[in-house]
Amino acid sequence: MPLAKIHVLEGRYDQSRIAKVSGAIQSALMNTLRVPREDFFQLIFELPKNRFLHTPSFVGMHYSDDIIILEISFIQGRPKETRLALLKDINTRVAAAAGISPDDMMIAL
């Protein structure tokens, strides 16, 4: 039962765009972890600029105000290869769905 916490900057994601992000995350979880469609738990946080702080760049990656910080909690025991595949799948799907740079996706498992 994964729990996804999606953090975005207030005003950057309207209802339609956040729905695309949400759907992309759930699709990646279903595809990579094989979670059932009805295993769906997400919390979405829109934070004001003074509460959503990040560096403009780090280790060759550049971040815009479209950055999404995603925390996913699930029961341990999945192999490293599966976790890495999940990171890649989420990044690819969310970047395409939201129209953001792949750099603008920070994921913590």
Predicted regions and their residues:
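Interaction-mediating elements
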Residues: M1-L109
